[in-house]
């Protein structure tokens, strides 16, 4: 589209159709120049052009045409028709111009939105920098506030955690003390009950062992009330007590052995038997120590010892009872027999064998005398029927001593005889008969002159206890 007043199609049509006067042409030129200036000014300032700037009624061409038509004289009909056609064409051109103006205004409006002036750009830049500065300052302030809150909250949380831990420690400490107090009370109650049971059991059942008490105590109880430490201490004390008792018994056996050995040595010297003096006594001590260490001590307990106030006597070699000595006269007659013509040294060995057999029982006799009254005679110490018959056959020369364990020397026969339960001394047939079905301590001197006999060769028929003397 061309500019108005610059030689467009509308001006060309108007010049050809209407030939205006010079005044009209000057006016039209002024109007066109004014319109061009207005358009240029609008384009430079980039203002939005509205449709109000181009009203259809105020068009200069239309007003000029109307004035020209009004001023023209209507002289002839042809001119009128021609004027009507020109008016119609002018109206159509005006409408086309209005449409073009509207399109141009729309284009200007759309182009003006995307374009900015330098002032607007500078203002926008200044505002953006200022707003960025404000945002950065707010961010720094926010960061400082967050750090301060973190520090304050961290200290507060730390203090709160420390306070909580202290409270928990105090609570645990109180619970521990309460539990310890309960355990102490339960322990004292159990200890008192245990002592009462021990006293009651010691008064009612003095011969009852610690094993039975232990089985009675093993009833359903609370496990935390059982004091294992006190039980272990009690067991250790009882074990030490039993060991001390064993040592005392051993010392008494040593002393009694030494005393009997000295008496036997003096008797041999008075009769004229061979004696070695102190060497023989020392040899007897060594032999007794060796024999006692080789024998199993069944009295030592591997389990818990006896309870307080109770005493279990250690087992000793059993005495030959009446049932053992009166089994059969044939058996007692088949024991080892020795001729009267036995040498004196062999007789001394036999006497020593009998002595040591009763020396080993010295400790038991001492404990037995403490427990039994002196007037009471047990059944195993009573003389048997065979012993009474042999004493009756022997005559009044030998006196039966049922309660004596000590061997005595018969000066008339020059033979050592022992009278007591389980030991028969007879002169009938010139033989010394000894019956010991129980275990005995071997004689160290007589071991060289006798050897064990197998069960098939044993003349007594007792198996391993049979001994054959080689003359």
Swiss-Prot record:
Name the major location. Answer: nucleus
Regions of compositional bias (Pro residues) in chain numbering: 305-316
Q: Which PROSITE patterns match?
A: IQ
Top-level taxon in the UniProt lineage: Eukaryota
- Cellular component GO terms, alphabetical: cytoplasm; cytoskeleton; nucleus; plasma membrane
Q: Does the keyword Chloroplast apply?
A: no
* Keywords noted in UniProt: Abscisic acid signaling pathway, Calmodulin-binding, Cell membrane, Cytoplasm, Cytoskeleton, Membrane, Nucleus, Repeat, Stress response
The Gene Ontology biological process terms listed for this entry are: abscisic acid-activated signaling pathway; calcium ion homeostasis; calcium-mediated signaling; cellular response to carbon dioxide; regulation of stomatal closure; response to abscisic acid; response to cold; response to hydrogen peroxide
Stretches the record annotates as Disordered? 1-35, 54-76, 196-221, 295-316, 416-471
Question: Compositional bias (Basic and acidic residues) at which positions?
Answer: 196-207
Record domain IQ: where = 119-147, 148-170
- Asked if the keyword Transmembrane belongs to this entry, the reply reads no
Cellular localisation:
Nucleus; Cytoplasm, Cytoskeleton; Cell membrane
Question: Which one Pfam family would you cite for this protein?
Answer: IQ
The annotated regions of Low complexity compositional bias extend over: 416-430
Q: Place the motif Nuclear localization signal on the sequence.
A: 2-9
Named from the GO MF annotations, one term is: calmodulin binding
Q: Region Calmodulin-binding: list its residue ranges.
A: 137-145
Null allele outcome, as annotated, is: Insensitivity to abscisic acid (ABA) associated with disrupted activation of Ca(2+) channels by hydrogen peroxide H(2)O(2), increased frequencies but reduced transient duration of [Ca(2+)] cytoplasmic oscillations, and leading to altered ABA- and H(2)O(2)-induced stomatal closing. Abnormal [CO(2)] modulation of the cytosolic Ca(2+) transient rate and strong impairment in high CO(2)-induced stomatal closing. Reduced induction of XERO2 in response to cold and ABA.
Family that this chain belongs to: Belongs to the IQD family.
| Subunit details | Binds to multiple calmodulin (CaM) in the presence of Ca(2+) and CaM-like proteins.
The protein's job, in short, is: May be involved in cooperative interactions with calmodulins or calmodulin-like proteins. Recruits calmodulin proteins to microtubules, thus being a potential scaffold in cellular signaling and trafficking. Involved in abscisic acid (ABA)-mediated signaling pathways leading to the production of hydrogen peroxide H(2)O(2) and the subsequent [Ca(2+)] cytoplasmic oscillations-dependent regulation of stomatal closure. Required for [CO(2)] modulation of the cytosolic Ca(2+) transient rate and for high CO(2)-induced stomatal closing. Essential for both cold and ABA induction of XERO2.
What is the protein name stated in its UniProt record?
Protein IQ-DOMAIN 21
Source species of the chain: Arabidopsis thaliana (Mouse-ear cress)
